[in-house]
């Protein structure tokens, strides 16, 4: 739902997911070089990604689960604790690593779960494509994805709008008769 890069997501701390409390919830992407899992924000650019109510509720449920696991294990959880953590294997509640995510994806793919050839980055591309197909301006998509320049977004996703326009032209007869 966010279009974040894997490294951005893995570097999040609990306090960087800000609940809306009557306003729009958001994730604050903070560049840092001290993540215990080595996760990094590309080009070290901070940004804010607004999220919907469904993801906000999912976060609240996830945080409750993490807090319960932490309490059972005697592990302290604070705003500066990693957001995405190990829950199935040691070290318990340690920052999730990229290799762990990629291993899980490989397992899911071997089981035939998900589209053929999908990767974590596939979700970022899908997010951007869906936004553009919904009519979101390119500059908004560019900022949401953290691209340094809108031209990067156009280079990667310009075909989406082109294809959409070409599909619309399939109904040329209705345009010609009006």
Model-derived segments and their meaning:
Residues 11-57, 67-72:
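Conserved tyrosine-mediated DNA breakage-rejoining catalytic core shared by Y-recombinases
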Residues 37-61, 81-104:
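C-terminal catalytic core of Y-nucleophile DNA break-rejoin enzymes
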Residues 58-69, 81-86, 105-108, 132, ...:
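Aromatic/pi-system hotspot detector in well-structured domains
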Residues 102-143, 147-150, 159:
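Short, basic (Lys/Arg/His-rich) helix/loop patches that form interaction surfaces
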Residues 145-171:
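Catalytic-site neighborhood detector that most strongly recognizes the C-terminal catalytic loop/helix
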């Amino acid at each position: 739902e966010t279009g974040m890069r894997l490294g951005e997501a893995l570097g999040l701390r609990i306090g960087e997911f800000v609940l809306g409390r009557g306003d729009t919830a958001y994730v604050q992407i903070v560049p840092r070089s001290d993540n215990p899992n080595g996760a990094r924000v590309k080009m070290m650019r901070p940004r804010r990604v607004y999220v919907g109510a469904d993801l906000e509720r999912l976060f609240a449920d996830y945080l409750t689960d993490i807090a319960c696991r932490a309490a059972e294990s005697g592990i302290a959880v604070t705003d500066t604790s990693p957001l995405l953590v190990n829950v199935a294997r040691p070290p318990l509640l340690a920052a999730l690593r990229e290799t762990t995510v990629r291993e899980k994806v490989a397992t899911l793919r071997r089981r035939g779960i998900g589209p053929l050839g999908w990767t974590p980055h596939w979700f970022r591309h899908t997010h951007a494509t869906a936004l553009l197909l919904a009519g979101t301006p390119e500059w908004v998509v560019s900022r949401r994805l953290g691209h340094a320049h809108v031209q990067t977004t156009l280079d990667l996703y310009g075909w989406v709008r082109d294809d959409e326009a070409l599909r619309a032209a399939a109904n040329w007869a209705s345009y010609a008769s009006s």
